[in-house]
Swiss-Prot record:
Gene3D superfamilies hit by this protein: Anticodon-binding domain (3.40.50.800), Bira Bifunctional Protein, Domain 2 (3.30.930.10), C-terminal domain of ProRS (3.30.110.30), YbaK/aminoacyl-tRNA synthetase-associated domain (3.90.960.10)
Gene Ontology MF terms: ATP binding; Cys-tRNA(Pro) deacylase activity; proline-tRNA ligase activity
Domain of life: Eukaryota
Gene: prs1
Subcellular location: Cytoplasm
Protein name: Putative proline--tRNA ligase C19C7.06
InterPro entries: aa-tRNA-synt_IIb, aa-tRNA-synth_II, aa-tRNA-synth_II/BPL/LPL, Anticodon-bd, Anticodon-bd_dom_sf, Pro-tRNA-ligase_IIa, Pro-tRNA-ligase_IIa_arc-type, Pro-tRNA_ligase_II_C
Catalytic activity field: tRNA(Pro) + L-proline + ATP = L-prolyl-tRNA(Pro) + AMP + diphosphate
Protein family membership: Belongs to the class-II aminoacyl-tRNA synthetase family.
């Protein structure tokens, strides 16, 4: 479990005494105490220690490590802990054993590193003095750079929630008996909560919580169990595995071809930018300042001047645009780069949605006229919309950002906005900005105006170029996962799935001869070869698992189509296709295999988009009175209102619609928005009887005259 998921889990279980602080990485109790002393707002507490021991075990048996949590001041002989679990002796567990069980280095392990996934693989021993402590306890929440402060009761509540009955040991009386803690008296059944999210009889390889009941945990499980990502040891950074990176490659391949049709060419600019250059455009740098990561030292030497790691590349690229653009004949200049950027300042990272480093493309173009720049802004916006609709099967709304939400330092920003049905939140999908002449004036990107008259100096007047920037990131992947996934796991549109169909041999029993088995499996391999030859990405699953296990595995990974082939199918000269989106079974004749499978994949792609669009459309509601605004939001809608399009009104709408924070919804500027923010001003405005009547229609937010219909919603 990641630190963020753990904190979310603790917030759900514990109503009081939960506080989390960040500090430098520590390696022992002394450095930990020192780090906390230099950290602000640390409550009074007792330090703890968490030790992982390896009990003496016969070679024929599986090692079950002991995880021991105690007060830092308690002496904890390993022999006593070993005796408590029925072993003769124990020693410190090697780092590889710790990482195998908990997935993190030993220095990061805390009692909360025990979870539902590994609880059955460990013995949990608690120091009696820790349980009896009157006050807060300090633990590492699976990261040595963070500390969570909780009560002893909270520790026991958490362990109970993951199915652990810890062994309590009084280390001050070595001869005393040890026993599992007594279960608490049974309480009256509580109202349904996220604790009710568990899916009964869920296989260990499958998703164990319902999407609609515990969305954060569901999302984390889907990403890890489907093999899309691996959590990294730096918070907010993630490893993209082939199952997710292939989606980015599909997007990259499609978009790269399309922008080249517009005359865009690829290049690459350095990762680093000097503070002098970064700070040249005031509004721009203020928009990114809290998120900029700085390199201040090389080895043991302090740098003379700190160097920023790019949060975006306007200030990296534009000094060289000024050098390269010397004449109107050099225009338009259209460059794109595929790279990663770093944006550091936030507390609640989410894979793909809010990460400290992310992959994206950023296009930067320079034009002779505003008209030319504006035309390109909308061309790119249309391409972004097609990525969502045609590849990811996700509906989006095209619009213009408000003044408050536009790109820092830009003239105007266009956007494609998505919708996550489970949470009722909007999500920004991609943006295409017209920067106007702001940056060209800062960086002196000028040409002679070819349409102006030659002046007394023999030269034509100078013209500052018009610029655009536009970007789309791996956030696209997270949006698709959230929109399409279900309680079984991922649900991938065929257009972007690494594996579009999987062939599974069926009907093999104990009575099946080796020859029959080989014939069935061999034919499955040939079916996969046929489909791959027809450019249908296919695998044959010949692993020594049951068909049921394979079905669950590929359903969880979201493969659009499963093809079953067994003795009965052989008799009928067919395969049985099973759609991931509907679980409908369709026989496909072998003599029409390639076309039959291709047609089914096309139907799946279309159905996934239409299903998502119908869900989205049902939750875009028009509201003309403020009294109806918040009730509409609370029904998981995004809301269209007649709006005056002023920043003051926008801020009041967000403030007045904010709701009480609970559960997984942390309250910080970059966290999922509690109040409704302006998502966009849709390019397609309501018409007919809903059209804005100038001088008559009132703003639903403030009562002044409305200018446009604005789309508002809680958002990521």
């Amino acid at each position: 479990m990641s630190v963020d998921s753990l904190v979310s889990c603790l917030e759900q279980l514990i109503t009081d005494d939960l506080k989390l602080v960040e500090h430098q990485e520590v390696s022992n109790g002394a450095t930990w105490a020192s780090a906390l002393q230099s950290t602000k707002d640390v409550p009074s507490h007792a330090l703890t220690k968490t030790i992982v021991l390896k009990p003496k075990t016969a070679k024929s048996q599986t090692v079950v490590p002991i995880i021991l949590a105690a007060l830092e001041t308690t002496s904890t002989p390993s022999g006593i802990a070993a005796k408590a679990v029925g072993s003769k002796e124990a020693r410190m567990a090697a780092a590889d054993l710790v990482e195998e069980v908990f997935g993190i280095p030993p220095t990061d392990v805390g009692i909360f590193s025990v979870n539902k996934e590994n609880a059955s693989k460990v013995h949990v021993v608690l120091d009696a003095a820790l349980i009896q402590h009157n006050g807060l306890l300090a633990f590492h929440p699976s990261s040595s750079a963070k500390t969570v402060f909780v009560s002893p009761a909270a520790v026991q509540t958490y362990l109970k929630s993951v199915g652990v009955n810890p062994i309590i040991v009084d280390f001050s009386a070595p001869g005393s008996a040890t026993a599992p803690s007594k279960p608490a008296a049974q309480k009256k059944k509580a109202e349904p909560s996220k604790n009710d999210a568990a899916i009964e009889n869920a296989a260990l390889i499958g998703i164990t919580v319902r999407k609609d009941a515990d969305f954060p945990n569901w999302y984390q499980q889907v990403l890890t169990k489907s093999d899309m990502i691996e959590y990294y040891d730096i918070s907010g950074c993630y490893i993209l595995k082939p199952w997710s990176y292939s989606i980015w490659e599909a997007i990259q391949g499609w978009f790269d071809k399309e922008i080249k049709k517009l005359g865009v060419r690829n290049g690459y600019f350095p990762l680093f930018v000097s503070s002098k250059v970064l700070e040249k455009e005031k509004d721009h740098v203020e928009g990114f300042a809290p998120e900029v990561a700085w390199v201040t030292r090389a080895g043991t030497s302090e740098l003379d001047e700190p160097i920023a790691i790019r949060p975006t590349s306007e200030t990296v690229m534009y000094p060289y645009y000024a050098k390269w653009i010397r004449s109107h004949r050099d225009l338009p200049l259209k460059l794109n780069q595929w790279n990663s950027v770093v944006r550091w300042e936030f507390k609640n990272p989410q894979p793909f949605l809010r990460t400290r480093e992310f992959l994206w493309q950023e296009g930067h173009t320079a034009h002779m006229t505003l008209e030319g720049a504006t035309e390109e802004v909308h061309q790119i916006l249309d391409l972004y919309a097609r990525i969502y609709t045609d590849l990811l099967a996700v509906p989006v709304i095209k619009g213009v950002k408000s003044e408050n939400e536009k790109f820092a330092g830009g003239m105007f920003t266009t956007t494609v906005e998505g919708y996550i049905p489970t949470t009722g939140r909007g999500i920004q999908g991609a943006t295409s900005h017209c920067l106007g002449q702001n940056f060209s004036k800062m960086f002196n990107i000028v040409v002679e105006d070819p349409n102006a008259e030659i002046g007394p100096t023999g030269e034509r007047p100078k013209l500052f170029v018009w610029q655009n920037s536009w970007g789309l990131s791996t956030r696209t992947i997270g949006v698709a996962v959230m929109v399409h996934g279900d309680d079984k796991g991922l649900k991938l549109p065929p257009a972007i799935a690494l594996v579009q169909s999987v062939v599974v041999p069926c009907g093999i029993t104990n009575k099946t001869t080796d020859q029959e088995r080989n014939e069935i499996e061999g034919f499955c391999s040939k079916l996969a070869d046929r489909l791959n030859a027809a450019d249908i990405r296919t695998e044959a699953d010949l692993r020594a698992y049951t068909p049921g296990y394979k079905f669950s595995h590929w359903e969880m990974k979201g493969v659009p189509l499963r093809l079953e082939y067994g003795p009965n199918d052989a008799k009928k000269n067919q395969v049985t296709a099973v759609r991931r989106d509907t679980f409908e079974k369709i026989p496909v004749p072998l003599n029409n295999l390639e076309k039959g499978v291709s047609d089914l994949l096309a139907k799946i792609q279309t159905n996934m988009y239409e299903t998502a669009k119908a869900e989205r459309d049902a939750h875009v509601v028009k509201v003309k009175e403020w009294a109806d605004f918040v009730p509409a939001l609370n029904k998981k809608n995004i809301v269209m209102i007649p709006w005056c399009n002023t920043t003051e009104c926008e801020k009041e709408i967000k403030k007045n619609s904010a709701r009480q924070v609970n559960g997984d919804e942390p309250e910080d500027e970059k966290a999922p928005s509690m109040g409704a923010k302006s998502l966009c001003i849709p390019l397609e405005q309501p018409s007919g009887e809903d059209a804005i009547i100038e001088g008559t229609t009132k703003c639903a937010g403030c009562g002044n005259l409305a200018k446009v219909w604005g789309l508002f919603g809680r958002s990521y």
